[in-house]
Every structure is written in C-alpha cells, then in structure tokens.
Amino acid sequence: MKFTLSWLKDHLETTATVPEIVAAMTMAGLEVEHVIDPATKLAPFTVCKIVEAARHPNADRLQVCQVDTVDGRKEIVCGAPNARPGLTTIYAPIGAYVPGLDVTLVEKPVRGVVSNGMLCSAAELEYASESDGIMELEGSLAVGTPAVDALGLEAVIDFEVTPNRPDWLGVAGIARDLAAAGVGTLKDLSIAPIAGTYPSPISVTVDGEACPAFAGRYIRGVKNGPSPKWLQDRLTAIGLRPINALVDVTNLISYDRARPLHVYDAHKLSGTQISTRLGRHGEHGDEHLIALDGKTYELTPEMCVIADANGERPIGLGGVMGGESTGCSEDTVDVFVESAWFEPIRIAQTGRTTGIASDAQYRFARTVDTGSLVPGIELATKLILELCGGEPSEVVYVGEVPAAPKGFAFDPDYVGQLSGLAVTPEKTHQILAALGFDVVLGSPWTVTPPTFRRDVEGKADLVEEVARIAGYGALPSTPLPEVPRAVGGILTAKQARARAARRALAAAGYAEAVTFSFTNRKTASLFGGGQDVLVLANPIASELDCMRPSLLPNLIEAAGRNARQGFADAALFEIGPTFHGDKPADQRTVVSAILAPKAPRGWDKAAQGDVFTVKADLLALLEELGAPVASLQTAQGSASSWWHPGRSARLQLGPKAVMAEFGEIHPAVLKALDVAGPVFGFEITLEAIPEPKKKSIKTKPAFSPSALMPLTRDFAFLVEKAKAAGDLVKAAAGADKALITAARVFDVYEGPGVPDGFKSVAIEVVVQPREATLTDAEIEALSAKVVAAAEKAGGKLRS
C-alpha cells in the first residue's frame, strides 16, 4: 500500500514530516517497507530555459542549444524534436546520474560539438514510462527551480498491510490511526448524499450466495476524457497508470477509502437489468468472459458473475475485474456505477483460480467495510459530477450486508492487567473513540466495533488497540523472575530420547531428512493408512492429501529422488509424528531409518548393507535409548504388510508390546513407489519403549576383575529351521547368570546328519568362575542347566 504526504493531509490536519509520519506508523503497528523519495535521485536536476536553438553543423537531427541554467548559460547538444527557443524544461549537469538511462553524464563531444549537460525527457527522469521529447514545463517557472518542486513530486510511503486490517488499504484508514496516535487531527470523513433527479433506468437483482448486497447509480450526460493533473499525479505517484476520468475516479476511491467500485458504459449494456449470480456450467462447458485485461477467463460455478441480458451474458467477475464488453471509453455518455459487497472467501478463491490479482480482488478478499456501499456511491457521484458533469439518478440498493459487529462488555482496568501499561480510563476512552469504536460508559463499559473493524472480537483485542496507540515504549522495564532449574533437565523423556536417537543415527552414518507430515492417500494405504478421517480437506498440494501413517514412505521416496539424481546409495532417518486416527492418542512419535545400498563397481559386487546391517543399527540405537534389549523377543514373519515376509521381523516385549519393526521393504511396495530396490529399514515407536527405572543414588563399586581364567563350552542343538537362533542364545545365557557371562552362535549347519526341516546351531558359552576354580562336577551341572534351558526354547542337544 502506497500513499503520499499530501494525500494523507486530505484527511489529516498535521504538520508532521515524512520521517515523523513513518515513526508514528511503525509505533502504531503499520509496518513501513520503505520510503521512495524522488528528491534523492532527482537532486541534480533543475529547471532551465532554451534561449537559442541552431541546427548541428554535422548532424541534421541534432540541435545546438544555448540554455540558461542554474550554472549559467550552457551549450547543450539535443536531439529532441520539440527543442526550441523559449521552451522551459529540465537540465542535467555534467556528473549527474540519469535514472531512466542508467548513465552518468560526462563531458564529451557529440559529432564534434561538446555538450555541457543534457536536456531531459519524462522517461529519462522516470517520471513517465515513455515520452516523445524533452519535458515542456510552465514558462513561469524560475530557472534553477529543483525538478522535484517543478514536477510536484513528493515522497511516497510504502507499507505492508496485515490481513486483519483491510481498513489500512485506504488512506483515510491510515489517517484515522495516526490521528488516534496524536500525529494530527482527523478531518471529517463523512460524505454528503447527492439527491437523484430521476429513477434509475437500470435495475439490479442479486443472488445472496454470489453477492449479498449491491448498490448502483445511473449517471447520464457525462463527458469522459483525461483526468485533471492533480488526479493523474496522485495515481502516478503510487504506481498506477491514469486511463480516463471515470476509471481514475474508481481507482482513487479504492485507494482513498478502501472501497472498490466499477463503472459500466450504460449504452453497452444489453437490457435494463444487471444480475449477480454464480457461474453456470452448460452443455458446451463453463461460461467465458473477456476481461478488461484482454484475457479470456473460464467462469466456474464457484465464481460470482455479473451479467446483463436477463442474466445470460457475463459482463464481469464480481469483486475481481469487469468485462471488456462494457468498459468505458472517451465516447461514453451514460454510466452505471457499481458499489457491492462480495463474500471474501469466494473472491479469494476466484483470484487463485483465475490468477487475477487486481486491486479490487485484493481488497474484497480481505473484506471491505460493509458500511461503505452507499458512501462509496455518493463519493463517486460527487467526483464524476465535478470532473465529467452529468445528472445522477436515485441510488439502487438491493440485498443485505452482514450484520454489524455486536457490542461487548469491557473493563478499562483490563488494559493494565493484560498489557502492564498504566493507561487511565479517560485515555482508553479517547483512544477507542478516535479509532471509531462506539463506547457506552458504565460499569462495565459496552464497546461496539465499527463495521470496518470486524477483526475485533473481544476485550483482549481492545487491549491490543489501546496498547499500540498508547505505545509499547511506555511499558515499564521489568526483569524476568528467576526460575529454578528443573531437576533432571527441561526435556521430557520422549524429547530426550528423540535427541539421543538423532545423535546416535547421525554418528552411525545416517543423514537426517525432514519431510512433510502428509503424503499421497494411495501411498498411505500401502503403509496401513489412508482412512477417510486422515484425508485433508484443503491440502497444500493434490499429491499431499493424507496424513502419513509411517515415516517410511516419505523416506523411501526421498531415496528414490536421490537415486534419479545420481545419488543411489542412501542412508536416511527421520524423527517425527505418525497418524493413525483423528484422536490425540492416535498420534505417535516414531524413529525411522532406511538403507538403500548400491553395489560398488567391483568384481565381488557386494552391496554395502542388508537386513542384518539395519538390525545391528536398530539394536545399537535401542541400547542407546535405554530399551531392555536383552529382554526383547524377535518375532519373525509377523511384521506389517509393507515388509518382505521372509526378511523382516518385530522386536517386542510381548505380543501386545511391539517396540520396533525392521527388515527389507516389500518389492511390491517399492514398485508402487517407483523406487528401485532393495531398500532396508526399521521403525521404532518411542512411546513403546518403557521408561527407565530410577537410577540408584548409590555409587557403583569399582570394577574388580576375577583372578580366575574364564572357560568356554561348546554346544550344538537341533532346532526347527524357522526357529530363531537368538532364542537359543538367550536361553543359554540365562541358564546361570552368576557364572555365564556370554553366549554366541559360531556355526549353523544344514545337511547330511541333520533331519529334514531342522538345522544345527552351535553355541559357545563363556563361563567366568568367581571365587574358586570350577570342578568337573560343577561344570557338568552347569552344562546340564544350559541344555535344559535350550530344550525349553525348542532345541535338542546333538549326540
């Protein structure tokens, strides 16, 4: 949003300078982006007068001019066709930077004649986009007058408008806030109604869903043409291109009062009725409109359409842009002025669908003051009559705008309670009244927001209004209270585990990925998700329409993208939430990792990773997280459907206490995701890891190694092929925890001597005597315990 100081002074009686205005705006919450001051870039340029102009001796199209300048009389070579004696124009001295040409002037001969400066065009000063010759100014201007003063240029303030303050999209709204902040006195913003002299020959019908309210007025006998200089200068200063008086009036009011309007050429209308309705879908597709920008747009049933010819011919996109067929030109004689209120969400969606980002669309999408329909018509009528003449009809008003905001109770003491500011009730009343709020004093007060402040919905909003105008700089400096450090740190157990997992996996060579919390519904269904309650109503992209049931699909797709870019060897992990329903309890925090090994180009072709690699990384990570790894059961063949059934397993404390799953991703899943395999991975549910027992505050005794040598005993057991060797190892190690310090598999054999359907698992058991060397009888008794424990686990000692 841009405006000039002189424009602001149309609504604000003030002596403040631009820097003071900018400072006050910043303190009041208006975020100033920058100030465009033409005096800076045009400082070297001044008014001059051509005294003589003679043809250049060496060039037919050039003239050698004698020019009176601020630096005295100068000889300047000029190629402009309108250079002539007596012309008052703009002079640029040697050394001046010409912004429109992006050059700095140097003294040099032009076809043999030295030019001591330059005579400038409007385009060269960036005063206009194009020009046919040097500038022609009023002859009464004194030589040496700064170009900025001669052209009436002034600083332009550009600031960012927050979505909740559409009233700031008009200069009058800015003036209101600055007046409340004490920068000046707000002038009367009311608009006197203009009586119509005849009934409007154009009637209006509205579809409340498309356009809740519509005001219009017929004005006959106008004389359209270029706008006066003051209006053109005002629009040009903020970057708008003047078109003609009728159109420029609507643009002025849009920026002056944040009230978009539209003007129709009444003679180009078909019939005597204008209708607002939703777009229609016919036998041959949706309707189309050629808009004022010359482009053709498809009108869908979600859009508001302005139509004539008994509602059959679209002539505009309501709240967005008018149609080319009814646009005003210099030949326009009779007009119909539109001032309507459109539903903001519909206008925002129309803008996104069509790609139109007009000033009207920008304002209606943020909501326009519902109380400005008739005042907007009256102001437009006043300006049109002043600039174009004509005779107005009575105002046509149909429909109903949303109800005005309701009042609510407010205690002025709440300002101090919530903000800490010491503001008297009298000052609070003064601020709220200056901002346009209706305040009824009492116990408590009753405060009603104005129609242009629908963002104010409660007493906390009122405190914010008072605080920003009173000034946050008035807040007393109060140090924060000292908070004792939390015992055991400030992280929860889950947060601490997530941090530990992140460090451990990074140390193991995995790279962390951060992906979206949603995925494609079809992809989610591959991983046990995709339920209706998890589908997004308004996804950020069509391929991200469902909350993720697992971190694995996003990681696998990331590995696939890396592979397509030439980085096939991927080791990725992510820590984040997964979603299994619409209740808070259905959200779980998960640690997932994948390994997509690529076989090196060597003679052995061995890939750098497999199921056992990710299992080892998984167990190491669980150990780091404090999980009871020694108590975990490996349940093979019971993992989820997205794992390879023969190359995956679960780690669990019991059938209902599943802690993690690992293995190779099912080839069918990889094919559906268009990712080359194999891909291995694991997934840990942090909530499934039991909380560690409180550590004893007693100091552990110093390590005291045994003075006796350990001994080993080997056992070979027959077990079914499907039996996990780890079960035998765990059973053997637990046979006598006082003496057995370790047990491990050193051989697995299948072949002659082993029955079909069985395998031989050889286990080495390490025995560490504590107090005395074990006798043969004690060793035999210990061996018997190992055999008995193995038999309970399904093993049979080979004879």
From Swiss-Prot:
InterPro entries: aa-tRNA-synth_II/BPL/LPL (IPR045864), B3/B4_tRNA-bd (IPR005146), DNA-bd_dom_put_sf (IPR009061), Fdx_antiC-bd (IPR005121), Fdx_antiC-bd_sf (IPR036690), NA-bd_OB-fold (IPR012340), Phe-tRNA-ligase_IIc_bsu (IPR045060), Phe-tRNA-ligase_IIc_bsu_bact (IPR004532). The keyword Cytoplasm applies. GO terms for biological process: phenylalanyl-tRNA aminoacylation. PROSITE patterns: B5, FDX_ACB, TRBD. Keywords: Aminoacyl-tRNA synthetase, ATP-binding, Cytoplasm, Ligase, Magnesium, Metal-binding, Nucleotide-binding, Protein biosynthesis, RNA-binding, tRNA-binding. Residues 706-798 form the FDX-ACB domain. It catalyses: tRNA(Phe) + L-phenylalanine + ATP = L-phenylalanyl-tRNA(Phe) + AMP + diphosphate + H(+). Its cofactor is Mg(2+). Tetramer of two alpha and two beta subunits. HAMAP family: Phe_tRNA_synth_beta1. This is Phenylalanine--tRNA ligase beta subunit. It comes from Caulobacter vibrioides (strain ATCC 19089 / CIP 103742 / CB 15) (Caulobacter crescentus).
